[in-house]
């Protein structure tokens, strides 16, 4: 027979246990394939956020809440991305952080929308992503229109380039970025002397670059990933092409110097990263980067802090709604003002970040060096 006091204690313990809940938040990115380093970097950012949140005393839906990260691999493949999205819907996740690139985020977004599950991408830049009319779709970085435009204007107005040759990898990301660069460069008075296309798995660009060489462009613009940019830079050097090399956030990584080897020279590469913090506001971001390096033993690749902020923003909306139910916290997410390590996060009616910054970088001594922050 259980003593009365013990029975009461057991009852209280059981009651407290029943009042706990596990809230599943997913992160999706390429953990395998040519841009696995980007996916792993973002996943690390999500894990840091989850671990910090679980150290706090958070109550949602009247229950003590523990957050669980469901980390999934889409291999940067649209078909795998949609399969993963359906898996997460079936698992009844409360929200999704991801995907990493536009080619996976866009097809997956329809599945999340149909299920009413909020999705915040920390790195998708295709303008199309937030132009589908989905109220569940958000991003915490600037889009390709802003990225490509900034690069085109910089080429014309700061580099004083007159001509450019353009190559894109035909992905939603690469094509969109190249189109925006061409539009801005032409508007600023530049001439596009050649346009060529490849794919996101290619590493041999000799035929394309040989055709470019005859045109003598001031700038070679690449709408693609660092996995392609590295070999392209090596082949440009071998062919004696002296042009500046420009591209977007997917080439603007800490891995580019390793991928390019001796093909990259000081100040040759100009790239733009969606996001950026002015010097006056860098204290929180620098602290995050230090904490990341202590935890993982390496520097961030590019978007880990934006992934961290995306997840923290989602949970902030849950806390404001006092619920992890997507129907209840989605309205709070749409009107959120969250101070993140990358700056203030709030969204416009489409789900784009308001006042998204863009940072331009070059490389010197195999290290990325900031040129300017613009909007």
Q: For the regions a protein language model found, what residue spans apply to each?
A:
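Extracytosolic ligand-binding ectodomains
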Residues: 1-6, 17-375
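Extended, low-hydrophobicity acidic Ser/Pro/Thr-rich
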Residues: 8-10
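N-terminal signal peptide c-region/cleavage motif recognized by signal peptidases
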Residues: 13-15
């Amino acid at each position: 027979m259980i003593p009365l006091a013990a029975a009461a204690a057991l009852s209280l313990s059981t009651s407290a246990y029943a009042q706990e809940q596990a809230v599943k938040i997913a992160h999706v990115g390429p953990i395998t394939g040519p841009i696995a380093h980007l996916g792993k970097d973002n996943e690390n950012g999500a894990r840091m956020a989850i671990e910090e949140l679980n150290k706090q005393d958070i109550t949602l839906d009247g229950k003590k809440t523990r957050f669980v990260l469901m980390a999934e691999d889409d291999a940067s493949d649209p078909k795998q991305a949609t399969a993963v999205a359906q898996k997460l819907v079936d698992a009844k996740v409360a929200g999704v952080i991801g995907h990493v690139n536009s080619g996976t985020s866009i097809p997956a977004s329809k599945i999340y929308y149909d299920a009413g599950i909020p999705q915040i991408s920390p790195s998708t830049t295709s303008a199309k992503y937030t132009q589908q009319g989905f109220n569940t779709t958000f991003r915490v970085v600037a889009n390709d229109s802003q990225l490509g435009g900034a690069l085109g204007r910089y080429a014309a107005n700061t580099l004083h380039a007159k001509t450019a040759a353009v190559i894109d990898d035909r992905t939603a990301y690469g094509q969109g970025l190249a189109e925006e660069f061409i539009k801005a460069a032409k508007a600023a008075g530049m001439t596009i002397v050649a346009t060529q296309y490849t794919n996101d798995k290619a590493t041999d660009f000799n035929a394309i670059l040989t055709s470019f060489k005859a045109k003598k462009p001031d700038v070679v613009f690449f709408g693609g990933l660092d996995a392609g940019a590295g070999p392209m830079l090596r082949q440009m050097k071998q062919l004696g092409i002296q042009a500046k090399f420009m591209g977007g956030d997917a080439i603007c990584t800490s891995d580019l110097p390793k991928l390019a080897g001796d093909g990259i020279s000081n100040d040759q590469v100009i790239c733009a990263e969606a996001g950026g913090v002015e010097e006056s506001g860098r204290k929180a971001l620098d602290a995050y980067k230090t904490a990341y390096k202590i935890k993982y033993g390496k520097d961030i690749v590019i978007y880990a802090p934006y992934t961290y902020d995306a997840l923290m923003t989602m949970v902030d909306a849950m806390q404001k709604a006092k619920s992890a139910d997507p129907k209840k916290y989605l309205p709070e997410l749409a009107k959120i003002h969250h101070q993140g390590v990358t700056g203030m996060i709030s969204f416009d009616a489409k789900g784009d970040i308001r006042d998204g910054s863009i940072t331009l970088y070059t490389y010197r001594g195999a290290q990325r060096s900031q040129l300017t922050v613009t909007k």
